[in-house]
């Protein structure tokens, strides 16, 4: 294990232990198999991988063996050069095809389909136009045979300060749910939950 991986594990494990001890379902963002093994061993349930389990050869095996849940995100390149890879012909169909392929790879590796969620990767290797094309066509992803997650919280808005984009985040979140998204990744959990509850009441869907 490289020193930076050891350092990350040392930083994360106490937090994971504390959250799991409080009964919280814990998700960890990582694309490194060693980190996955460590946090899953302490009770984390979900791995969120921006590389869709492609950066580390062992990651597929680790997730399958642990019977963990995983979020597969679309991204071209890596976090350092991803914005040099925005030359899409059809961003919606290309992202769909990538995620569809990664689902199949994961299932073939022994990961249960019920444990997989996909994320179109808003803001990752996409320019503003691409991002809004994806948001506009989210219903296109309903045909993928697993849960769908999106992270758009605080990414867009008239205010340049990300912390002041609550209204836009809630609006886009509700729109995403209406288009078939199952999971919202948000900063403002309480406010988003209240807005969703209000919308569900209006739609007579609250049980």
Describe the predicted segments one by one.
Residues 107-109:
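Conserved C-terminal portion of the radical SAM core fold
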Residues 1-26, 31-34, 40-41, 45-105, ...:
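Active-site-adjacent loop and "lid" segments of alpha/beta metabolic enzymes
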Residues 112-115:
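Short acidic capping loops at alpha-helix termini that bridge into adjacent secondary structure
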Residues 122:
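Active-site metal-binding loops of divalent metal-dependent hydrolases
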């Amino acid at each position: 294990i490289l020193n930076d991986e050891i350092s990350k594990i040392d930083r994360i494990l106490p937090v994971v232990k504390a959250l799991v001890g409080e009964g919280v379902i814990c998700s960890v963002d990582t694309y490194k198999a060693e980190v996955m093994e460590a946090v899953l061993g302490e009770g984390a349930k979900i791995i969120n991988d921006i590389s869709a389990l492609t950066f580390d050869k062992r990651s597929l095996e680790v997730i399958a063996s642990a019977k963990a849940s995983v979020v597969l995100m679309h991204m071209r390149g890596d976090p350092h050069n991803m914005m040099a890879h925005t030359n899409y012909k059809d961003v919606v169909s290309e992202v769909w095809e990538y995620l569809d392929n990664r689902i199949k790879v994961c299932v073939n590796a022994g990961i249960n389909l019920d444990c997989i969620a996909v994320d179109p990767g808003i803001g990752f290797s996409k320019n503003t136009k691409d991002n809004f094309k994806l948001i506009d066509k989210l219903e296109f992803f309903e045909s993928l045979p697993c849960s769908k997650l999106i992270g758009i919280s605080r990414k867009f808005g008239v205010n340049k300060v990300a912390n002041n984009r609550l209204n836009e985040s809630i609006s886009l979140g509700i729109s995403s749910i209406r288009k078939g998204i199952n999971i919202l990744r948000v900063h403002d959990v309480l406010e988003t939950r209240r807005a969703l509850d209000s919308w569900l009441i209006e739609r007579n869907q609250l049980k």
